[in-house]
């Protein structure tokens, strides 16, 4: 698997210093075991597990730190745990746990990580799954218990509303 050059991780200054001391690149962290990271970073096993998971999830094309954090939020710590999962069901679980519905492109990301976990095929990005998601939702809709509040209505989440995104695009033009 080809490593991404840019992996973002929420590391402390001490953890960054230890990685520099051992000449370890962020893009290589997913190749270490949790036990090795625990030792190298002088971290708890839980912290090492989370760092490793965030690094591994970012090896998937077009997946960044925020979505990697979403996967950890759902309790996943390795790509192998996502094998044979259903991207639509993961989306529905995520929305229930967050108590708001999310941007539809996030479902495309769930579909991508499941696909990647099953195949290892790095040739696709999340937007390759948009037609599949649209077809599925047209045929199946969303669950009756889907949260009513949208992600952009949540306070302090750093999300932009669809209208704000259009405004930003217009300002850049």
Show where each model-derived region lies:
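C-terminal extensions
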Residues: 1-173
